[in-house]
From Swiss-Prot:
It comes from the Eukaryota. One of its GO terms (molecular function) is ion channel inhibitor activity. This is Conotoxin VnMKLT1-01121. It comes from Conus ventricosus. It is found in: Secreted. The lineage of its organism: Eukaryota, Metazoa, Spiralia, Lophotrochozoa, Mollusca. The presence of a 'disulfide through disulfide knot' structurally defines this protein as a knottin. Residues 1-22 form the signal peptide.
Protein backbone atom coordinates (compact mmCIF):
# COMPACT_ATOMS: atom_id res chain seq x y z
CA UNK A 1 0.00 0.00 0.00
CA UNK A 2 2.80 2.40 0.87
CA UNK A 3 4.60 1.62 -2.37
CA UNK A 4 1.43 2.29 -4.35
CA UNK A 5 0.97 5.65 -2.65
CA UNK A 6 4.60 6.56 -3.27
CA UNK A 7 4.27 5.66 -6.94
CA UNK A 8 1.11 7.75 -7.31
CA UNK A 9 2.77 10.75 -5.64
CA UNK A 10 5.87 10.35 -7.81
CA UNK A 11 3.82 10.20 -11.02
CA UNK A 12 1.81 13.27 -10.01
CA UNK A 13 4.98 15.16 -9.12
CA UNK A 14 6.70 14.28 -12.40
CA UNK A 15 3.59 15.20 -14.38
CA UNK A 16 3.37 18.58 -12.66
CA UNK A 17 7.10 19.13 -13.16
CA UNK A 18 6.73 18.42 -16.89
CA UNK A 19 4.00 21.02 -17.24
CA UNK A 20 5.84 23.61 -15.16
CA UNK A 21 9.12 23.32 -17.07
CA UNK A 22 7.57 22.98 -20.56
CA UNK A 23 7.84 25.92 -22.94
CA UNK A 24 4.73 28.01 -23.26
CA UNK A 25 3.20 27.71 -26.72
CA UNK A 26 2.61 31.49 -26.70
CA UNK A 27 6.26 32.17 -25.77
CA UNK A 28 5.19 33.19 -22.29
CA UNK A 29 8.41 31.93 -20.73
CA UNK A 30 10.65 33.43 -23.41
CA UNK A 31 11.05 36.72 -21.55
CA UNK A 32 11.08 35.34 -18.02
CA UNK A 33 14.31 37.19 -17.18
CA UNK A 34 14.65 39.92 -19.83
CA UNK A 35 17.30 41.94 -17.99
CA UNK A 36 19.59 39.05 -17.17
CA UNK A 37 20.93 38.81 -20.74
CA UNK A 38 21.85 42.48 -20.90
CA UNK A 39 23.38 42.58 -17.44
CA UNK A 40 25.78 39.73 -18.17
CA UNK A 41 29.46 40.46 -18.62
CA UNK A 42 30.66 38.07 -21.34
CA UNK A 43 34.31 38.72 -20.50
CA UNK A 44 33.77 37.52 -16.94
CA UNK A 45 32.39 34.17 -18.04
CA UNK A 46 34.72 31.23 -17.48
CA UNK A 47 32.95 29.31 -20.24
CA UNK A 48 34.35 31.59 -22.93
CA UNK A 49 37.97 31.17 -21.84
CA UNK A 50 39.97 28.56 -23.74
CA UNK A 51 43.17 28.79 -21.67
CA UNK A 52 43.07 25.20 -20.46
CA UNK A 53 42.37 23.55 -23.83
CA UNK A 54 44.73 21.43 -25.90
CA UNK A 55 46.00 22.61 -29.28
CA UNK A 56 45.42 20.69 -32.52
CA UNK A 57 47.35 17.42 -32.88
CA UNK A 58 47.86 17.00 -29.12
CA UNK A 59 46.69 13.94 -27.21
CA UNK A 60 43.35 14.53 -25.51
CA UNK A 61 42.50 11.01 -24.31
CA UNK A 62 39.45 8.86 -24.83
CA UNK A 63 36.52 10.54 -26.62
CA UNK A 64 34.60 12.28 -23.88
CA UNK A 65 31.92 14.84 -23.26
CA UNK A 66 33.23 18.33 -22.84
CA UNK A 67 35.79 20.39 -24.63
CA UNK A 68 39.36 19.41 -23.72
CA UNK A 69 40.44 20.62 -27.17
CA UNK A 70 40.30 24.22 -28.35
CA UNK A 71 38.39 23.12 -31.44
CA UNK A 72 35.93 21.04 -29.40
CA UNK A 73 36.70 17.84 -31.34
CA UNK A 74 38.48 15.08 -29.42
CA UNK A 75 39.09 11.59 -30.78
CA UNK A 76 42.32 10.50 -29.04
CA UNK A 77 44.02 13.59 -30.57
CA UNK A 78 42.65 17.10 -30.91
CA UNK A 79 41.39 18.09 -34.34
Amino acid sequence: MKLTCMMIVAVLFLTAWTFVTADDSRNGLEYLFPKAHYEMNPEASKLNKKEDCEAGGRFCGFPKIGEPCCSGWCFFVCA
